[in-house]
């Protein structure tokens, strides 16, 4: 049954067409655009004469079925027209403020929707929440403040798809991601005019955003090149037009500097792959664990944990690895800013991703040309230019988008990429190097950093543990090109000798951490290299495990860097004796970690124990580690030290007991001179019976017993 349309008075909104002209969707009523009347008078005449409009067979009408009357009246046609234009016209009337205070009429919705909504981000959210397509609104929305809105805002408030604009609404196909079926969402032409003044500022910004977002993500998905984004499923809701993006996101997110700062905080949560230093090294045996912890239960737990870690290598998980990768799929403007942050810090812990990156870089020629590797010829040229624009120029379309790489790479980390080749590093050296501050190849035995990665003079941290190709020639190259070097981790680089350390100490005065520990070829590092590091650098952390470090080199280190030393790792330095470590500890007041595993010639542990207790009294707990022999000697030395302290306390008590009694100076009692017998079971058996000392002890014991009875008689709270 066709719902009846309420009568309208002269003040109703239908009479306002004399003041405002609405270009109605006449194609839905009259068929093809050729049959559309030129004015409302022809429309009235055709309806009054009863002529039926010519309907195009290629485009079926989406109107509800006409009533049984063969000649519809003007009122009925107006009701149908109002039901069609309700979604957008009611919004225009609510914004312009030309609606009477009367209650708006209620119209029945059409029998079928006007058009299928485009699969945009908003449409997807509505469909997910409501379980269907976006419903037609039957009542006008509340009034909106028009001070901050222009025509673009009004057009998006209507029932328009993201492809529609106030000027035109073409029927555009929407291609899904690679591997999915292609679907088309058809929209009907809709156009209207408004008496509101258009804001030129909004139009200018909209045109600029359009210019940045001309290119579609379809090019990336259809490309045959092997690239990390080629297999990414890019949904259609993330590739909407400029009008849809500008209407859904906040204005602040369209400002390049603000967006860059926001994404910088996202990037700050990403953990760089690294090997965290252990709080304590694993015990060598169960007895060693018992000597360390002093408790059987803790010792068993530590030993079981050590066995488990030895059998199953740890897989370090780094959180936030894909945080910025999701930002790449928002829109093209976010893609450019996110990519800039990703290239600022390059780190890989997966061999497959590293291979893809090398393949992409070799195909495009440089990481800056990442956007051009899949462009087709009909798009505008994005060739690399000499100037480097800022983000404002990128957003406004005043410069080429591939020149975004104004911030060079500062971090380059390869974490356990054992199959990395030297040819790959040589290919990327001039594209990544030049401004590196952190360079790390962790257990990459087959590669060594080339000169291009060391150039620029900004390198501060170089970590190359397990790189067997690092030698003295490489250290001389580092010394010449990295004057600001502060951290040099060269563990298991067994070709490094004193010559390389001397060159490094002469050109890198800011060096604070040096680790040249090794298990083989320890004779290459001796007094000459350690002495040069101690004299010419600011080293506070030294790792020389397995090296031929002697007592003289330790005195050099204590003399020049004593109070600045923080960590000393001397495991396996068999040349160290009691003439070095026990004697230099008073000069190293800030020492926090001391590792002496395998230093079997050190037997004077009293000085080490006194140093440890001195640090603990000042609320500093140093970590002193050793092997099983070292720990057993430490425990024995601690017991002997406790016995010595007990003897001193007892000796002081005996001296106080035999001191002259000032209260009874007139009474002189001949005291028997005795020597305390600590081997006796009774420590007071040597005191003569009936002497002043015995009376003092009896009085003292009486006072102690009375005080204990007094405390025991007090009620407990």
From Swiss-Prot:
<keyword id="KW-0539">Nucleus</keyword>
<feature type="compositionally biased region" description="Low complexity">
    <location>
        <begin position="38"/>
        <end position="74"/>
    </location>
</feature>
<keyword id="KW-0131">Cell cycle</keyword>
<dbReference type="InterPro" id="IPR032675">
    <property type="entry name" value="LRR_dom_sf"/>
</dbReference>
<dbReference type="InterPro" id="IPR006553">
    <property type="entry name" value="Leu-rich_rpt_Cys-con_subtyp"/>
</dbReference>
<keyword id="KW-0963">Cytoplasm</keyword>
<comment type="similarity">
    <text>Belongs to the AMN1 family.</text>
</comment>
<dbReference type="GO" id="GO:0005634">
    <property type="term" value="C:nucleus"/>
</dbReference>
<comment type="function">
    <text>Negative regulator of the mitotic exit network (MEN), required for multiple cell cycle checkpoints. Required for daughter cell separation and chromosome stability. Involved in copper sensitivity.</text>
</comment>
<feature type="region of interest" description="Disordered">
    <location>
        <begin position="697"/>
        <end position="717"/>
    </location>
</feature>
<feature type="compositionally biased region" description="Basic and acidic residues">
    <location>
        <begin position="90"/>
        <end position="104"/>
    </location>
</feature>
<feature type="compositionally biased region" description="Polar residues">
    <location>
        <begin position="1"/>
        <end position="26"/>
    </location>
</feature>
<dbReference type="GO" id="GO:0005737">
    <property type="term" value="C:cytoplasm"/>
</dbReference>
<protein>
    <recommendedName>
        <fullName>Antagonist of mitotic exit network protein 1</fullName>
    </recommendedName>
</protein>
<keyword id="KW-0498">Mitosis</keyword>
<dbReference type="GO" id="GO:0019005">
    <property type="term" value="C:SCF ubiquitin ligase complex"/>
</dbReference>
<dbReference type="GO" id="GO:0031146">
    <property type="term" value="P:SCF-dependent proteasomal ubiquitin-dependent protein catabolic process"/>
</dbReference>
<keyword id="KW-0132">Cell division</keyword>
<feature type="region of interest" description="Disordered">
    <location>
        <begin position="1"/>
        <end position="149"/>
    </location>
</feature>
<dbReference type="GO" id="GO:0051301">
    <property type="term" value="P:cell division"/>
</dbReference>
């Amino acid at each position: 049954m066709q719902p009846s349309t309420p009568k309208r008075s002269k003040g109703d909104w239908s009479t306002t067409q004399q003041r405002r002209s609405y270009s109605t969707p006449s194609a839905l009523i009259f068929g093809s655009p050729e049959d559309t009347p030129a004015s409302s008078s022809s429309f009235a005449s055709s309806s009054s004469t009863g002529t039926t409009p010519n309907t195009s067979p290629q485009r079926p009408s989406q109107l509800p079925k006409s009533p049984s009357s063969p000649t519809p009246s003007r009122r009925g046609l107006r009701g149908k027209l109002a039901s069609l234009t309700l979604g957008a016209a009611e919004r225009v009337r609510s914004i312009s403020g030309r609606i009477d205070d009367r209650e708006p009429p209620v119209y029945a919705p059409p029998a079928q929707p006007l058009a299928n909504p485009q699969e945009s981000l908003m449409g997807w959210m509505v469909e997910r929440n409501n379980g269907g397509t976006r419903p037609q609104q039957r009542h006008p929305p509340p009034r909106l403040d028009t001070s901050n809105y222009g025509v673009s805002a009004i057009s998006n408030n209507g029932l328009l798809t993201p492809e529609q604009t106030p000027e035109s609404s073409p029927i555009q196909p929407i291609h899904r991601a690679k591997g999915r079926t292609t679907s088309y969402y058809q929209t009907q032409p809709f156009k209207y005019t408004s008496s509101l003044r258009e804001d030129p500022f909004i139009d200018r910004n909209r045109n600029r955003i359009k210019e940045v977002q001309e290119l579609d993500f379809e090019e990336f998905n259809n490309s045959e090149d092997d690239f990390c984004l080629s297999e990414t499923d890019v949904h259609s809701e993330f590739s909407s037009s400029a009008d849809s993006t500008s209407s859904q996101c906040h204005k602040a997110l369209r400002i390049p500097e603000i967006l860059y700062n926001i994404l910088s905080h996202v990037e700050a949560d990403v953990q760089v792959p690294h090997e965290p230093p252990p709080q304590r090294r694993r015990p060598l045996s169960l007895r060693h664990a018992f000597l360390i912890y002093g408790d059987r239960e803790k010792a068993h737990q530590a030993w079981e944990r050590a066995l488990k870690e030895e059998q199953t290598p740890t897989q370090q998980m780094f959180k936030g690895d894909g945080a910025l990768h999701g930002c790449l799929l928002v829109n093209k403007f976010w893609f450019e800013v996110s990519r800039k942050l990703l290239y600022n810090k390059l780190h890989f812990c997966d061999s497959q991703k590293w291979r893809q990156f090398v393949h992409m870089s070799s195909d495009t020629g440089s990481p800056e040309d990442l956007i051009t590797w899949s462009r087709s010829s009909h798009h505008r040229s994005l060739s690399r230019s000499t100037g480097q624009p800022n983000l404002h120029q990128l957003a406004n379309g005043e410069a080429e988008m591939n020149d975004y790489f104004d911030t060079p790479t500062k971090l380059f980390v390869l974490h356990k990429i054992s199959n990395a080749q030297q040819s790959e590093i040589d290919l990327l050296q001039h594209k990544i190097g030049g401004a590196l501050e952190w360079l790390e190849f962790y257990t990459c035995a087959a590669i060594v950093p080339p000169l291009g990665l060391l150039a620029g003079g900004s390198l501060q941290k170089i970590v190359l543990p397990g790189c067997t190709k690092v030698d003295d020639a490489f250290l001389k190259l580092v010394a010449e090109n990295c004057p600001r070097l502060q951290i040099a981790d060269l563990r298991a680089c067994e070709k490094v000798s004193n010559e390389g350390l001397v060159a490094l100490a002469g050109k890198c005065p800011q060096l604070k951490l040096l680790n040249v520990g090794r298990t083989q070829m320890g004779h290459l590092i001796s007094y000459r290299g350690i002495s040069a590091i101690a004299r010419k650098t600011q080293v506070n952390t030294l790792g020389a495990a397995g090296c031929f470090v002697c007592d003289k080199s330790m005195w050099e280190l204590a003399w020049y860097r004593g109070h600045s030393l923080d960590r000393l790792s001397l495991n396996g330095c068999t040349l160290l004796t009691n003439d070095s470590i026990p004697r230099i500890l008073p000069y190293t007041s800030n020492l926090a970690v001391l590792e002496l595993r395998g230093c079997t010639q050190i037997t004077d542990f009293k000085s080490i124990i006194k140093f440890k207790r001195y640090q603990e009294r000042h609320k500093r707990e140093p970590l002193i580690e050793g092997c099983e022999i070292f720990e057993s000697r430490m425990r024995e030395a601690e017991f002997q030290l406790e016995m010595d302290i007990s003897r001193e306390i007892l000796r002081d008590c005996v001296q106080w007991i035999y001191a002259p009694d000032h209260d009874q100076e007139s009474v002189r009692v001949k005291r028997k001179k005795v020597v305390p017998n600590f081997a006796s079971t009774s420590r007071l058996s040597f005191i003569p019976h009936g002497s002043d000392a015995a009376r003092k002890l009896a009085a003292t014991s009486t006072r102690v017993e009375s005080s204990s009875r007094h405390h025991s008689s007090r009620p407990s709270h």
